[in-house]
């Protein structure tokens, strides 16, 4: 006789509970189907500078001339597809779109903008530097790009739109902004939602133009930086705003050849703007790269700003390396250190150098040009004693204790006197001789150390956090010459480079 106890009819309340559980289970399953899948987000990811970057299929990322936007917890990256292209043929193929939740692992989503049979997006056309921003008022993603002929005579901007991040985008045409030339470009969206076009105008300089409310056209001119011409213009622009300060980044005009890229600052987009100065170690050509964008990674514990550049390989543009490095930004000083490896926690908004920074503890600093050591004059222990260069003598007045403050920022304390390397009166003037002073934690006693030369070497440039100037010896190889702060530049790179031991 079969056991029938498990088949008893449940009472009415039990039947209702059973039905409710079943219904909730079905609804839960349906909800899971309706919610779009997202990529898993790792707590921390590691970047290896100069390494090949690939997507989920192992294909080299085509994120050249990077455009990037974050939607929810996902970044969407846009780039020029340079696969198979060389400097002899840079004609348009397509604009790619990828997605990532950690900026290290990317999934190819498809072509955001495809080549057409004719017109601006047709064969033998130039389409460069795609930048995307979102217009909340119109619920539209807006892409700007450089549109040109192969001889770069048209110098226009193109505009495309989409209702979704990766598109496909609908091309809406091209124009010269306010009638001006426009080649390399960038976009900036201010905290109030107003958007701006950054545009290289060979006749005048780097333009900042306000976009219309729908972002589809240029409304008015805001500022022009530089004087125009090949020597007075800046291209490949990018911009961020931090605590009311605007920072614009860009490259000198040297074609496919790399150069020491520069930045300027202002508290208003209309200016006045500071003079342009290097943000990476002079002479390194921005560690072999050209500015493409600056990525803002805002998290629960802080905000990291990532310099994104292209290391162009003219024989294989599609294989050009993506050079992404964290920026150190303090006040009006921007510094880009060189880290062979570094880690990013995108959720926290924090980064850590894996290599490329010196160890804490006692070091000597030898000038690359003179081979002399940084020295407290006469072995003095007095506040205000001058800093000079002197042949190695083994004294503790030539030894400095490095203490890391944050990022690649250190203080240097004389082992003999216990006083800190200091810029007198917090001066921001080039040529001021350094001295030692009571340690007080001021930015005039903090130095960003930038690795130069070999990834495994120990040579650094030291940049004053307060002044943005470099520690050097004004090109002198004379015993007893003053150690001062210098403006920097590739011509004086050796006299501003120090080997730690």
Regions found by a protein language model. Name each.
Residues 1-42:
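Secretory targeting and sorting signals
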Residues 34-36, 60, 69, 89, ...:
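A generic structural signal for short, solvent-exposed coil/turn residues
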Residues 6-10, 29, 37-40, 68, ...:
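Intrinsically disordered, low-complexity regions enriched in Ser/Pro/Gly/Gln/His and often acidic
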Residues 33-34, 39-42, 164, 387, ...:
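Short stretches within intrinsically disordered, low-complexity N-terminal or propeptide regions
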Residues 6-12, 34-36, 78-80, 400, ...:
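Intrinsically disordered low-complexity regions specifically enriched for long asparagine
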């Amino acid at each position: 006789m079969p056991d029938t106890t498990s088949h008893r009819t449940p009472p009415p309340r039990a039947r209702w509970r059973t039905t409710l559980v079943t219904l909730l289970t079905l609804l839960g399953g349906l909800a899971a189907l309706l919610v779009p899948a997202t990529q898993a987000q790792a707590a921390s990811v590691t970047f290896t500078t100069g390494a090949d970057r690939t997507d989920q299929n192992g294909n080299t990322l085509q994120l050249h001339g990077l455009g990037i936007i974050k939607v929810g917890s996902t970044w969407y990256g846009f780039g020029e597809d340079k696969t198979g292209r060389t400097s002899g043929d840079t004609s348009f193929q397509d604009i790619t779109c990828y997605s990532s939740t950690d900026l290290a692992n990317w999934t190819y989503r498809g072509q955001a903008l495809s080549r057409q049979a004719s017109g601006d997006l047709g064969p033998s056309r130039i389409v460069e530097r795609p930048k995307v921003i979102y217009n909340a008022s119109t619920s539209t993603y807006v892409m700007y790009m450089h549109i040109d002929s192969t001889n770069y005579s048209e110098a226009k901007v193109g505009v495309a739109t989409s209702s979704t991040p990766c598109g496909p985008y609908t091309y809406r045409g091209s124009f010269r902004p306010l009638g001006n030339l426009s080649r390399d470009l960038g976009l900036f969206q201010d905290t109030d939602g107003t958007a701006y076009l950054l545009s290289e105008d060979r006749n005048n300089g780097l333009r900042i133009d306000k976009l219309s409310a729908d972002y589809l056209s240029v409304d008015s001119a805001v500022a022009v930086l530089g004087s125009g011409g090949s020597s007075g213009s800046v291209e490949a622009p990018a911009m961020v705003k931090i605590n009311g300060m605007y920072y614009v980044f860009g490259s000198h005009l040297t074609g496919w050849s790399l150069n020491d890229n520069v930045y300027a600052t202002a508290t208003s987009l209309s200016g006045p703007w500071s003079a342009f100065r290097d943000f990476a170690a002079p002479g390194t050509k921005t560690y072999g790269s050209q500015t493409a964008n600056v990525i803002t990674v805002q998290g629960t514990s802080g905000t990291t700003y990532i310099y994104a550049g292209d290391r162009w390989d003219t024989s294989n543009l599609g294989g050009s390396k993506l050079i992404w490095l964290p920026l150190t930004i303090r006040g009006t000083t921007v510094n880009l250190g060189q880290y062979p490896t570094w880690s990013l926690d995108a959720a926290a908004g924090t980064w850590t150098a894996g290599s490329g920074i010196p160890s804490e503890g006692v070091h000597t600093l030898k000038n690359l040009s003179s081979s002399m050591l940084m020295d407290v004059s006469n072995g003095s222990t007095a506040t205000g004693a001058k800093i000079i260069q002197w042949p190695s003598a083994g004294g503790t007045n030539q030894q400095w204790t490095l203490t890391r403050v944050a990022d690649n920022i250190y203080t240097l304390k004389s082992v003999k006197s216990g006083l800190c390397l200091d810029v007198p009166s917090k001066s921001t003037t080039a040529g001021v001789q350094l001295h030692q002073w009571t340690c007080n934690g001021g930015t005039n006693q903090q130095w960003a150390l930038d690795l130069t030369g070999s990834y495994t070497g120990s040579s650094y440039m030291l940049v004053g956090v307060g002044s943005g100037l470099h520690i050097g010896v004004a090109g002198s190889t004379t015993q007893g010459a003053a150690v001062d702060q210098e403006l920097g530049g590739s011509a004086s790179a050796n006299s501003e480079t120090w080997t730690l031991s």
